[in-house]
From Swiss-Prot:
Keyword list, A-Z: Acetylcholine receptor inhibiting toxin, Disulfide bond, Ion channel impairing toxin, Neurotoxin, Postsynaptic neurotoxin, Secreted, Signal, Toxin
Family membership noted in the UniProt record: Belongs to the three-finger toxin family. Long-chain subfamily. Type II alpha-neurotoxin sub-subfamily.
Molecular function per GO: acetylcholine receptor inhibitor activity; ion channel regulator activity; toxin activity
Entry-linked Pfam families: Toxin_cobra-type
Name of the protein described by the UniProt record: Long neurotoxin 1
Organism: Hydrophis hardwickii (Hardwick's spine-bellied seasnake)
Cellular component aspect of the GO annotation: extracellular region
Record InterPro entries: Snake_3FTx, Snake_toxin-like_sf, Snake_toxin_con_site, Toxin_cobra-type
Amino acid sequence: MKILLLTLVVVTIVCLDLAYTRTCFRTPYKPETCPPGQNLCYKKSWCDAFCSSRGKVIELGCTAKCPTVKDGKDITCCATDNCNTVANWKSR
């Protein structure tokens, strides 16, 4: 009986650990596992005072709901692992 109980506990723990979680690129540019409930990746970009010399500021991360678009900001959301890439950056 003890062996059966122990087996059930081990199986439960293994099943809970196998729950799928999204992986997104985060700022700084590296892939990370998203917190529970955050199943979307996003890429937000905008111009600041240095936009003409450095280019747009880019923010990457995980979210539960795609952020609302505000004036001057571009927001893209996606729902596959590491889908919020930046064209000129390389993963390290």
